[in-house]
Amino acid sequence: RQLHINRFVPYGRAKTFENKLNMEQFYKWVDRGYDFLRNIYINYYKQNKEFIFNIDVSNDLCNQVYSKGRKTSCGVNCNQISIDSNGNVYLCPSLHIEEFELGNIRTDNITEIMEKSKQKYGEIDVEMLSKCKNCEIKYYCGGGCRAIAFNETGDLYGQERNCDNYRNRVFDLMLQ
């Protein structure tokens, strides 16, 4: 069994509607869905049932709480790339922005593209994110979504606006 739900990342045309969204209502909706899915995951976990469970909408909180040691929240510049229909390679599916274009698989060697990316961006982990360095849950959280941080701050290494709410969610899960 497998469940995968993508996160809401306001970028591109969706960014123009971001200010029109009632974020309080949006997060209440996300929380209701998150609570429902969290209960499913906890039940599977307690029963030792195998279940591939990726909840990007809540940044995969359940898996993170039960697997300490994460230095990244995803595979950005580590084991993930995104390729568009023209062969352009990007750091992340949510960062299809010219600034983050790494090369093109039609004209460039994929190994060289990855090496160039590592040289340009280094390892993007909680140890290099200034707001995360002293955070008590950094190895559960992994530093949050780099695409959301970039879209909110203009900085790939910035902090998501929702960081404090996220930290509280992790603590709530730990107490269950």
Name each model-derived stretch.
Residues 88, 94-176:
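Flexible mid-to-C-terminal extensions adjoining Fe-S/redox cofactors in radical SAM and related proteins
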